[in-house]
């Protein structure tokens, strides 16, 4: 419940003792310069740290990172709204995960530059992750970045990329030449925008590396499960019948996508006013 305006780092959590800490209901705005400027930076030990980062409204002005998390295990990033604009740095990131194990990234709303033809989005990414074993990136909405979701290196384990909506982007989903996210079977990601290059890109040059991140989709359930344009050396998306994941049915985001307004808790006086129990009957 803080309003934070900063020129370098809005909130820094640096090698804190592992706990179940929370960063919730904050408004954070960083107008800094340089490659290290971030709104929220969490540098963890490589052990379970269990941070819950939820319902924050984050604005990245002349900075690089909305949320930056290095190392740590089992951190959750939920229902955050992140605005990244403008891009004065060469690159900018909504959420950046570096070696974070078992991260949960759900129900976030990420919006970048709105002048793609002029800026080419620079090298911005809505969500970037590498070395994020057993990740769960589900039901996020990304728009107006160069890369909607960008993946680097190997992300082993049971990775889940589900129910994400790729809006207007230069490239929707981007995997580097050695990137691995595991098989994604009927996970219901939606390509619902204009893509100035490709909706989905895999830079791998061998079929074996591409198949370690292959997608099964059922376009009969929803035509938007099938990216409108794909760049890959081998078949990456296969259309076959199956039961598709949807965010609504799974009730992943009961508060909707992004930052939400909280109901004010009633105190005892509020409850008395509502009930009409103020004792006025004892006075003329």
Stretches found by the model and what they are:
Residues 1-4, 42, 52, 126, ...:
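Short, intrinsically disordered, charge-balanced linker/junction segments flanking boundaries
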Residues 5-16, 30-48, 60-70, 81-100, ...:
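Extracellular beta-strand/beta-solenoid scaffold signature
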Residues 6-14, 18, 36-39, 48-50, ...:
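Extracellular distal adhesion/interaction modules in secreted or cell-surface proteins
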Residues 19, 75-76, 103-104, 134-136:
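Repeated loop/turn-to-beta-strand initiation elements of outer-membrane beta-barrel proteins
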Residues 139, 158-163, 184:
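A detector of tandem-repeat and repeat-rich interaction/domain scaffolds
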Residues 175-230:
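Polybasic, proline/glycine-rich intrinsically disordered low-complexity segments
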Residues 208-284:
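Extracellular/surface-exposed low-complexity segments
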């Amino acid at each position: 419940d803080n309003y934070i305006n900063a020129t370098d780092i809005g909130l820094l959590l640096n090698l804190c003792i592992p706990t179940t800490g929370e960063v919730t209901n904050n408004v954070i705005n960083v107008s800094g310069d340089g490659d290290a400027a971030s709104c929220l930076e969490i540098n963890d030990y490589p052990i379970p740290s269990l941070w819950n980062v939820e319902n924050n409204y984050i604005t990245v002005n002349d900075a690089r990172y909305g949320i930056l998390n290095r190392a740590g295990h089992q951190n959750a990033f939920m229902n955050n709204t992140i605005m990244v604009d403008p891009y004065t740095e060469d690159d900018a990131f909504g959420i950046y995960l570096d070696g974070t194990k078992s991260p949960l990234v759900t129900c976030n709303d990420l919006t970048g530059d709105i002048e793609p033809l002029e800026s080419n989005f620079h090298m911005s990414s809505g969500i970037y992750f590498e070395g994020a074993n057993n990740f769960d990136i589900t039901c996020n909405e990304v728009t107006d970045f160069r890369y909607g979701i960008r993946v680097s290196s190997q992300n082993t384990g049971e990775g889940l990329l589900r129910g994400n909506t790729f809006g207007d982007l230069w490239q929707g989903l981007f995997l580097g030449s050695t990137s691995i996210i595991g098989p994604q079977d009927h996970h219901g990601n939606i390509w619902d925008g204009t893509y100035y290059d490709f909706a989905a890109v895999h830079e791998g040059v061998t079929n074996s590396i591409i198949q370690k991140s292959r997608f099964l989709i059922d376009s009969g359930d929803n035509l938007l499960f099938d990216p409108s344009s794909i760049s890959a050396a081998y078949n990456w998306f296969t259309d076959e019948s199956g039961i598709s994941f949807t965010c609504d049915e799974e009730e992943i985001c009961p508060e909707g996508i992004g930052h939400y307004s909280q109901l004010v808790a009633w105190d005892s006086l509020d409850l008395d006013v509502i009930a009409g129990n103020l004792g006025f009957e004892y006075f003329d």
